[in-house]
């Protein structure tokens, strides 16, 4: 995979995510699909010390995030259970504002593992059951959207636990190619509503309505909030929204060439701009020392250097 991003050039006043600007979109589309990673191996970067990346390591990780909104790092030695490496890695990419979600640890980084008892079996991430397609924090308030994520593997399960990823910009591209009206529907401010979260009769989070796709005003980059769950969501009841959701559901259930499948090994992790992902079911073997534990840090920040306004600069026409 090439580290170059110089093929993407257009006047700064245009946006490929403006549904009325077809030329800017086609220019961005050409760049996006050119040399796009075809497998998880294309996203992997070996690093010696995640707390102090070398310039070459940082560039390799960043270039993958610029193209695919994600990179996988691999550490060969060290203390994989050291939580500080998660925060330190994130800070080197401008990730600082942690989302202290409901089940986060005291340091706002979440230990994802099977939890027994109250709360554990209710929230699927803390079970060994499959976790359907979603972006993190899709239920958050508009000013607390999760834009960056670091997911670090301390130990893997005895069996299963594979993740599948899809770059949300690729999802945008495929939807727009199919029918721009699908995107217009999914960008409506009331396209998707998440019901209130109530525990023991107490509302701990109010209902949240918002778009599936939006464009960050500061960076010009697209953002996505989505869940494939059906019992925790209400879609706007209009034809284009239903058609768009149906197309997206079929895409995620299929075998698209853009789906990235990977089972994180101890010492590996993914840093991303909150791309679409799901998790397969898994089986732990505590007696054999194989218990799945991942650290998850969710940020209100986007990976610095991946902003559209940073990449989409200068004036250079697309080919043709």
Feature locations, PLM:
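N-terminal, charged low-complexity regulatory/assembly segments
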Residues: 68-77
């Amino acid at each position: 995979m090439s580290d170059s991003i110089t093929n993407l050039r257009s006047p700064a006043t245009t946006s490929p995510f403006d549904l009325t600007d077809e030329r800017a979109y086609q220019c961005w589309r050409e760049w996006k699909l050119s040399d796009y990673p075809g497998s998880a191996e294309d996203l992997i970067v070996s690093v010696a010390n995640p707390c102090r990346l070398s310039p070459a390591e940082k560039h390799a990780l960043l270039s993958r995030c610029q193209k695919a909104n994600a990179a996988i790092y691999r550490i060969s030695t060290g203390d994989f259970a050291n939580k500080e490496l998660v925060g330190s890695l994130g800070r080197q990419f401008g990730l600082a504002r942690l989302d202290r979600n409901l089940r986060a640890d005291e340091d706002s980084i979440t230990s994802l593992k099977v939890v027994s008892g109250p709360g554990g079996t209710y929230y699927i991430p803390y079970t060994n059951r499959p976790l359907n397609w979603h972006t993190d924090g899709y239920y958050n308030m508009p000013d607390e959207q999760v834009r960056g994520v670091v997911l670090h593997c301390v130990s893997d399960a005895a069996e299963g636990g594979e993740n599948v990823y899809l770059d949300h910009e690729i999802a945008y591209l495929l939807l727009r190619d199919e029918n721009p009206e699908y995107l217009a529907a999914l960008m409506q401010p009331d396209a998707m509503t998440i019901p209130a979260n109530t525990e023991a009769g107490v509302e701990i989070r109010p209902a949240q309505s918002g778009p599936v796709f939006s464009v960050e005003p500061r960076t010009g980059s697209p953002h996505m909030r989505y869940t494939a769950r059906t019992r925790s969501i209400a879609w706007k009841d209009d034809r284009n929204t239903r058609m768009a959701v149906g197309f997206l559901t079929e895409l995620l259930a299929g075998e698209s060439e853009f789906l990235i499948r990977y089972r994180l090994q101890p010492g590996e992790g993914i840093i991303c701009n909150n791309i679409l992902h799901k998790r397969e079911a898994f089986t732990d073997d505590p007696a054999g020392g194989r218990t799945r534990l991942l650290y998850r840090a969710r940020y209100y920040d986007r990976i610095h250097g991946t902003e559209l306004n940073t990449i989409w600069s200068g004036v250079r026409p697309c080919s043709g």
